[in-house]
Amino acid sequence: MFGYAVRRALRKSKTLRYGVPMLLLIVGGSFGLREFSQIRYDAVKIKIDPELEKKLKMNKVSLESEYEKIKDSTFDDWKNIRGPRPWEDPDLLQGRNPEILKTNKTT
């Protein structure tokens, strides 16, 4: 009889029903996140091969270097062409006649 009363009281208790699972989730989640964040610190400790590091430094690209490459380019003949939507025919949209393209491909 006493066991039944205790089980009934525990079942009705909102703290045990909602509070304890919430606390378990918070505490368990913090331990889980600690493990995932530890991966970041472990990855920083790994040293890169010196030869690979030299290659990475050689291929470094900056905004200024890319600007110097395209600075002298002319864009006078540039034409903005909208890309086709999935239901549209790309040849018709870009002003190309598909029948002319077929004859050019066959000859």
UniProtKB/Swiss-Prot annotation:
GO cellular component: mitochondrial inner membrane
Keyword Transmembrane listed: yes
Keywords from the named record: Membrane, Mitochondrion, Mitochondrion inner membrane, Transmembrane, Transmembrane helix
Predominant cellular place of this UniProt entry's protein: mitochondrion
Superkingdom classification of source: Eukaryota
UniProt-listed GO biological process terms: mitochondrial cytochrome c oxidase assembly
Annotated segments matching region Disordered: 80-107
Ranges facing Mitochondrial matrix side: 1-14
Keyword Glycosyltransferase: no
Stretches in topological domain Mitochondrial intermembrane: 38-107
Any matching Pfam family: COX16
Subcellular location(s) per record: Mitochondrion inner membrane
Assembly and oligomerization: Associates with the MITRAC complex. Interacts with MT-CO2/COX; specifically interacts with newly synthesized MT-CO2/COX. Interacts with SCO1, SCO2 and COA6.
Family as reported in the entry's similarity comment: Belongs to the COX16 family.
Function: Required for the assembly of the mitochondrial respiratory chain complex IV (CIV), also known as cytochrome c oxidase. Promotes the insertion of copper into the active site of cytochrome c oxidase subunit II (MT-CO2/COX2). Interacts specifically with newly synthesized MT-CO2/COX and its copper center-forming metallochaperones SCO1, SCO2 and COA6. Probably facilitates MT-CO2/COX2 association with the MITRAC assembly intermediate containing MT-CO1/COX1, thereby participating in merging the MT-CO1/COX1 and MT-CO2/COX2 assembly lines.
Protein name, UniProt field: Cytochrome c oxidase assembly protein COX16 homolog, mitochondrial
Provenance organism: Bos taurus
Organism lineage: Eukaryota, Metazoa, Chordata, Craniata, Vertebrata
Gene that this polypeptide is encoded by: COX16
